[in-house]
Amino acid sequence: MTARHPEAHLSHRSGWLRAAVLGANDGIVSVAAIIVGVAAAGSSRSAILTAGIAGLVAGAASMAAGEYVSVSSQADAERADLSLERRELTEDPAGERKELAAIYRSRGLSAALADQVADELSAGDVLSAHARDELGMTELSHARPFQAAGASAASFTVGAALPLLAVIVSPANTRIELTVAATVVALALTGYMGARLGGAPPGKGTLRVVIWGVAAMALTMVVGRLVGTNV
């Protein structure tokens, strides 16, 4: 008899993975675009690095704050829903038991089996049963603000460090070209890794990330050259 291999599910990664991939891509694109724009204006290496580091610090702080506020709002909504459900279970347990049975009937169970399942779950941790089956809340989907904020800030910093490193090691006459090349490679890698970790086809996701990153750098390069010419 062939041993059955456990399936590798990816849904438990959804919260931190989304924040980490978004943070890394944003760090790469944001700081690379700043660097290319400032370099296109004819600025010195020192000025370019100063602008890039400032963008890294500001971006990491902004990503962390944004994720924390967003996920905290989600957590507040979850707590409010659970509080409401807890009150309804106290005030009308029979009605909530019927509601639970109706949910199971809508999923294909017979009326008798749905009633039996609702009775057994209601005899145990009934709030968890309603949270899972009525509200769609599970431990895997539970909002974690600090985890999301930390993942965003850390990944933004790592992503932003790549174009900064390209500026440090590249000569002045090829600084823009090497920064763009390093950024494209980094975006391709993060796009590919994000797609693979998320269980999605990597080709389309990688191409989408690279195209938008190149577009952002092209725009800031044009602006940088215009400003450098006219100022």
Region locations from a protein language model:
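Small-residue-rich segments of transmembrane alpha-helices in multi-pass membrane proteins
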Residues: 159, 208-221
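Juxtamembrane boundary at the C-terminal end of a transmembrane helix
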Residues: 221-231
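The feature identifies polytopic integral membrane transport proteins across all domains of life
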Residues: 12-23, 45-53, 113, 144-150, ...
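Interfacial loop-to-transmembrane junctions
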Residues: 189-214
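Structural signature of hydrophobic alpha-helical transmembrane segments
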Residues: 173-185
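Cytosol/matrix-facing amphipathic helices and coiled-coil assembly/linker segments
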Residues: 1-19, 71-153
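Core segments of transmembrane alpha-helices
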Residues: 27-32, 152-162
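Internal alpha-helical transmembrane segments
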Residues: 1-70
